[in-house]
Amino acid sequence: MGRRHHFHIDHDGHSVSATVETGRTAVVEVLVDGKETGHATTHDDHPVTVHVELPTDPPTQVSVRATPGPGVPRCIFEAPAMEPHIMSPRPY
């Protein structure tokens, strides 16, 4: 049975959240402004990148790179023309 870990970042006026459910098959869900916009699965502790769009005009392509393990999962937010940012873990 896996455990759920939550991460968040605000970017360009939009809320980006990620949930990583660990286990033999890790599941990553990404929400933009509260709506699920992307998901992916990976096996064991292999990293996975989820590509999503921010609803800007024109839409902005961003991605969340999730690493389920080993240890505590982590998520990195990547957007054009900026350094990658570590997403803050959330306790809920």
Enumerate the language-model features and the residues they cover.
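Cysteine-centric segments in proteins
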Residues: 1-92
